[in-house]
Amino acid sequence: MTLEADKQTHGFQTEVKQLLQLMIHSLYSNKEIFLRELISNAADAADKLRFEALSAPALLEEDPNLRIRVEFDKQAHTITIDDNGIGMSRDEAIAHLGTIAKSGTADFLKTLSGDQRKDANLIGQFGVGFYSAFIVADHVDVYSRRAGLTAAEGVHWSSKGEGNFEVATIDKPQRGTRVVLHLKENEQHFAEGWTLRSTLKKYSDHIGLPIEMVKEEHHGKEEEKDAPKEAEWEAVNKASALWTRPKNDIKDEEYQEFYKHISHDMTNPLAWSHNKVEGKLEYTSLLYVPTRAPFDLYHRNAAKGLKLYVQRVFIMDQAEQFLPLYLRFIKGVVDSADLSLNVSREILQSGPVVDSMKAALSKRALDMLEKLAKDAPEDYKTFWKNFGQVLKEGPAEDYSNREKVASLLRFASTYDTSGDPSVALADYIARMKEGQDKLYYLTGESYAQIKDSPYLEVFRKKGIEVLLLVDRIDEWLMNYLHEFDGKSFVDIARGDLDLGNLDSEADKKAQEEIAKTKEALASRIKATLGEDVAEVRVSHRLTDSPAVLAIGEGDLGLQMRQLLEASGQKVPETKPVFEFNPSHPLIEKLDAEQDMDRFADLSHILFDQAALAAGDSLKDPANYVRRLNKLLLELSA
């Protein structure tokens, strides 16, 4: 492997340069994670070889027993990780070790603050794989040959992490990849047998193939110690796939480390569910709920889905057919005994086996979230902060689990003045007033914008709780979530508000009588506002404000209009209903006004104020200001 040909120097991709600088100057408290990352890469390489060898057994050459070997040299201050997995060609080494193809990289780099300790945590969230070698090494050599290529087509990749790397063609008889770390002066303590063994046990005990180190002999006689002896390798891990072991034999720490292995996320998961199904279908699943959202959660082409194994043989990453899109944040493994080893993504698109597994895994994931919400409410708050908007896609996508998904949703409400989205629908129902049979809600841009909205006035007066829906997809969500626990949802800004049994018969009769006495005023206002409004009527929503704009029953609300505008779609024109409070002093003054110009100015001012109170923008702000200034001048005269 010493003869090199066709040596070239390449520059790292810009994002890699930035990551390398962070690695080189890293303030990681647990620098030993470099070993976990490199072992994880080696295990992935073995999985890929197993899969490709299903259709091309010759790729195994004469070395079918896959393993990872870890060596160290105290004198040379090196650590070597050697695998006999799939290996890399020259082009693959340049592509895989010189660039980052992971979506969301640019977003990730933008979040870096320059504070090295904070950035170290962010790097851990992102997962840097191979580049973590530079946490402890100032020079890294990689020797590799892809399975199926000749011995003369090996590649040597070398870098000091200083902006460029060298590649050369070498002879490499053995298939696979050998990574040699030349340790920094202050990191040479890692080149110790006990340190490496304990680190491997801590982070990589779950890896499903042997991780071997040279057996360390403890001799009692000097002559035995001096006698030359061929190295004897021994496995330092359990070397069995974690999900195949009985649940009772697996420690929490092992579950956590396995999650980090499959997700490349350095934070512990919030929850996990390990389940073996036997009977008509046979499969094992191990599902995890992450603590943090990945940077590419909202990227349409981002990697998602479970790792798929068939009878313990790795088939593919990101098998997205086993969970609906709204559960795309779930990480994990599914190992089936009912799918064939030559299964493809196309075959997975449909079929009774996949459909049945998808339904069961979806239910298991939702059960896991339900248990998290019940047993660890603070952890569920963390989950909701990171993944709540994604879960809100569920009622539209998964009709069969609509009620279950709805029970997991959280909203702000008038019950909790903190504005935190902490109210479950079941909690709301438990607090409903006697005679209340509807779930009332209001949508808006933010909690601050709607917490004192005029739409809430009658509900505050009667002590009725209202859900405050302030995520940008909430109005869209409510198009699919019509009821919960047999009770209908009502948008309090929409249509002619009917409080049902919450209003007494006397109240309803009084409202009808007042509306009749104000019919003439309603007609005058409608004639003045003209095409700006669909209707003018007396309001039953208001106690303190003079007027409010109600949304027509079939019309789009502000959130939906903004969503459509943002996506470049045509927004249908809608006209609000102008409702006025007959007992408000301004309305009484308006009713008594005989000067038509002043009546028109005041009517338009009230209309524009109602639009602003609803969170909308004014079509003609200049005219609003002109009218308001004119009125103020008259009042101050």
Swiss-Prot record:
It is found in: Cytoplasm. One of its GO terms (molecular function) is ATP-dependent protein folding chaperone. Signal peptide: none annotated. Transmembrane segments: none annotated. Keywords: ATP-binding, Chaperone, Cytoplasm, Nucleotide-binding, Stress response. Residues 346-562 are annotated as: B. InterPro entries: HATPase_C_sf, Heat_shock_protein_90_CS, HSP90_C, Hsp90_fam, Hsp90_N, Ribosomal_Su5_D2-typ_SF. Residues 1-345 are annotated as: A. SUPFAM superfamilies: ATPase domain of HSP90 chaperone/DNA topoisomerase II/histidine kinase, HSP90 C-terminal domain, Ribosomal protein S5 domain 2-like. It comes from the Bacteria. Residues 563-637 are annotated as: C. One of its GO terms (cellular component) is cytoplasm. Homodimer. PANTHER family: HEAT SHOCK PROTEIN 90 FAMILY MEMBER. Molecular chaperone. Has ATPase activity. Belongs to the heat shock protein 90 family. This is Chaperone protein HtpG. It comes from Xylella fastidiosa (strain 9a5c).
